Amino acid sequence: MSNKINPKRREPTAAAAAAVAAGVGGGVGGGASGVATANTNTTGSSSTGGSSSAGTTSSANTSSSSSSSLSSAGGGDAGMSADLTSLFECPVCFDYVLPPILQCSSGHLVCVSCRSKLTCCPTCRGPLANIRNLAMEKVASNVKFPCKHSGYGCTASLVYTEKTEHEETCECRPYLCPCPGASCKWQGPLDLVMQHLMMSHKSITTLQGEDIVFLATDINLPGAVDWVMMQSCFGHHFMLVLEKQEKYDGHQQFFAIVQLIGSRKEAENFVYRLELNGNRRRLTWEAMPRSIHEGVASAIHNSDCLVFDTSIAQLFADNGNLGINVTISLV
């Protein structure tokens, strides 16, 4: 039984407004092969960066509430700790203001992210001065802050120096849409990922069984292209991704990889095998599937997947279509 998935192009991919002004799912089949149509990508990759500059160091003015709470820094009482962390809330985004902490001339704080978008203090409308608040920085070093993913179930309390690193890999952080491309901005808990795919990405075909054939059509399309298919077996769902991109100037390559709709710990229970077979030739790749928490971008960047160029693809292709045998096994 064969299902087809046709090519399509991938479309390219505010702090408080008042403050700124003052500054899978498709058909489920029981067949053994599915056809994935291409999604062409017109967007490039981008990176963002930021910088912060430390201004004048002074014994900064602090509000009376800050002063009255300083003696409690480092205390063990949970309620008092919560009171202290509330002093660090940014009045614009309600995230925490962490060192280096800058204040306005009246002692009001705002986080670095929002500060870059403002022309005046969101609290008093006074000028934003580059004044370091050393007293609040000292308090911050003795306070434990909740993980920003606490709403998703994380119970960690962290000193500010460990907060960013923890949050980047927190197991409770929301899952992003696993589909290639930057057009879908959905994020949410793991148990809603499949529901999202079924509702918002209905063109993706799902095949049942641990052995299937992933048939990518029109592999000779120019530009950046991707093919996606779902595979369901062992009570889990796997997403098969084939991307064609120009990783080096003038040299297009194919990257094939499998990711589990699940956590990294769950992914450790499986191994996947990709095989190109035909014309008395065979090309194989075997590895642990990626968790969708990790995504596939870093694996593709590091070539930690099945990689082959367009000339190799032509050795296995039939009239512009490429079949990849996919096998999922329990470890």
Swiss-Prot record:
A zinc finger (RING-type) spans 90-125. GO terms for cellular component: cytosol; nucleus; ubiquitin ligase complex. Zn(2+) 1 binds at C147, C154, H166, C170. Residues 139-331 are annotated as: SBD. Keywords: Cytoplasm, Developmental protein, Metal-binding, Nucleus, Sensory transduction, Transferase, Ubl conjugation pathway, Vision, Zinc, Zinc-finger. Zn(2+) 2 binds at C177, C184, H196, H201. Its main location: cytoplasm. It is found in: Cytoplasm; Nucleus. Residues 34-72 have a biased composition (Low complexity). GO terms for molecular function: identical protein binding; ubiquitin conjugating enzyme binding; ubiquitin protein ligase activity; zinc ion binding. A zinc finger (SIAH-type) spans 142-202. It comes from the Eukaryota. GO terms for biological process: enteroendocrine cell differentiation; positive regulation of proteasomal ubiquitin-dependent protein catabolic process; proteasome-mediated ubiquitin-dependent protein catabolic process; protein ubiquitination; regulation of R7 cell differentiation; sensory organ development; sevenless signaling pathway; ubiquitin-dependent protein catabolic process. It catalyses: S-ubiquitinyl-[E2 ubiquitin-conjugating enzyme]-L-cysteine + [acceptor protein]-L-lysine = [E2 ubiquitin-conjugating enzyme]-L-cysteine + N(6)-ubiquitinyl-[acceptor protein]-L-lysine. E3 ubiquitin-protein ligase that is required for specification of R7 photoreceptor cell fate in the eye by mediating the ubiquitination and subsequent proteasomal degradation of Tramtrack (ttk). E3 Ubiquitin ligases accept ubiquitin from an E2 ubiquitin-conjugating enzyme in the form of a thioester and then directly transfers the ubiquitin to targeted substrates. The RING-type zinc finger domain is essential for ubiquitin ligase activity. Component of some E3 complex at least composed of sina, ebi and phyl. Interacts with eff. This is E3 ubiquitin-protein ligase sina. It comes from Drosophila willistoni.
